[in-house]
Amino acid sequence: MIVRGREVVGTSPHLYVSLFSSPQSCIVLLFLTSFFPQTVMSALRVALLEVERKFCSLAVKDLASNSGQPAFKNIRALAQKTIHDVYYDNSSGSLISAGIWVRQRNGSWEAKVKRGGDYTNSMFEELAGTEPVRRCVMDVIGKEGCEKDHFGLGTIADLSTVRQSWIADNEFKIVFDTMDFGHTVGEVELQEEVQFTATENLSIEQRKREKMKEMNKRIEMFMDRYSWAFHLGVPKGKLSAYFELHPIGKKQ
């Protein structure tokens, strides 16, 4: 299960927070971005939530043919795209040891900072942009670095992903990724933009979690209904698969 959200609060700078919760290789990811003007009350939260559940592979060769029973209400293919990820750490593995994964995705700097949990149920804070990543790296390794020299880090993983995508039943996004080293993994995603306000009994974070659970349940029902389309199995993340081929003794 993956959750991405864009949260709006006053005039504060960009903030990305990630929550990973992955029973049966499900991941929850929440991205928060602040952009409302000063006049907006701080109690208002607008979140773009995306819930994603992984699967091992597609069970049919041509998903768009919609040949299973019951058939999708409708399905359309999206343009294929390529994602290039380069992951970094220092020679001592300080970032990974601290639960931080720094990468360039299609040339843009990102960092995932682990905030708790374990391999199957983890929480991460997601940072995006050169300056937030630079500060994150500096806080761990204790010295200044510049983007030109990759903040003093070396490459630990370099991989490309070809992503095929479809939209089914007008709202569920199905993606299937093929990495350049042969590993494959799929995801079903559901995205909604939701406005949250705190209530007497529930905080905004509690309301988000309740919404995430509801969205995840809808994905479970979707995948159960169209089980002919998916080989569920036990999905393996792309970095876990990559490091099996190029061991550094770590998993995402």
What are these regions (language model features)?
Residues 2-8:
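Intrinsically disordered, glycine-rich low-complexity segments
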Residues 15-17:
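Short hydrophobic alpha-helical segments enriched in small aliphatic residues
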Residues 36-252:
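Phosphate-end processing signature that detects enzymes handling 5′-triphosphorylated RNA
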